[in-house]
Amino acid sequence: MSNKLISQMGLPSSLANVFSARNILTAKDALSLPEFDLMALLDVDRDQVRTAVARISEIACPPCRTALSLMEDRALTGGYLPTRLLGLDRALRGGIPFGALTELVGPSGIGKTQFCLKLALLAALPSSYGGLNGRVIYMDTESKFHSTRLIEIGRSSFPHIFNSEGMAQEMAGRIIVLRPASLDELTESLQQIQLIILQHDVKLLIVDSMAAILVGENERSTTGQKQHSCHLPLSFLKSLAEFSQIPIVVTNQVRSQNNYEVVHYPFQGIQWAHAVTIRLIFEAHSGQRFIKISKSPTSPAIAFPFLVKSSGIALLSDEGLEVTGSEMSTIRCEGLNVLVEGAEPFPHLGC
């Protein structure tokens, strides 16, 4: 709740604009500052500051809920977007959760985009076929979205649907693709998305990838600007997930100290790791690729070997491998080039 944007809290526009001009953008930004500091920064009197802080506190503070009401809400909304990977869905207690931020992190070419494409199809499918029967917003920052691969996954996974006349076009037409090329464009797109979600019955938001935008931005920024550039879209995505109660999935890249390291780390740092609700690590070692549940409030740390097929990602076993200690958070990239070269010959798999 602390990440709610002040611009959406119903403050007088003149005061909301002053907050924005001083880069005080979220409830946390405002409530972390003493009253006199806010008066000095905003150049307004104490009464205005107190009124604004009271309003921000009221909006940001979550209402009291009983465990029963939370359970009833979860049962009413369904709560999850199933991935159709039986072992993973079972471990995640149903799939990708509604109202939360789920991160997919791993090296390029491991299968993150393949996973995202399948999720997009699953959200667009009619309810009678187990889908969410809605639209999908797919923010493609690296131009890795391929409509031909999307249809290929659909026809291989759901031939009874996609071989029907006009169904492939209908499913593809439910997926809205945006291609922001900079942080400013990404931020502008995110600010427009809240209204789009309400108007167009959007059931899933995918950002593939957040890191790609921030890499170039960070190269041009100071340390303080780097933290701010990461904080703004992250705060908005968390607020958007809570507000819309749809699943939001973001992909993240990895980094290493040099080109010879086997163990890699997420490109985004500690702040990002704490913000996401679910973290799924995509890694390669022992001659196989794995999806690993690295962070989840309800699931064990467990890894599943997988491969990429014409129908998308497929688990080699629904029985996961227990992960302990440092293995829970590390990302191994052993022999990934060999795995990619030896994969089935689909032209769009390197994502």
Model features per residue range: what roles?
Residues 1-67:
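Compact, charge-rich alpha-helical regulatory domains located at protein termini
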Residues 17, 32, 36, 40, ...:
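Solvent-exposed alpha-helical segments within well-ordered globular domains of core cellular machineries
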Residues 18, 37, 41-42, 52-163, ...:
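The Walker A/P-loop phosphate-binding site
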Residues 55, 59-62, 91-95, 107, ...:
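Conserved, well-folded catalytic cores of nucleic-acid-processing
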Residues 82-85, 98, 113-114, 144-147, ...:
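Amphipathic alpha-helical transducer elements in NTP-driven molecular machines
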Residues 102-104, 137-139, 176-178, 249, ...:
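Hydrophobic/aromatic beta-strand patches that form the interior of the parallel beta-sheet core
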Residues 131-223:
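Conserved inter-motif catalytic segment of the P-loop NTP-binding fold
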Residues 227-348:
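Phosphate-binding/switch region of NTP-binding enzymes
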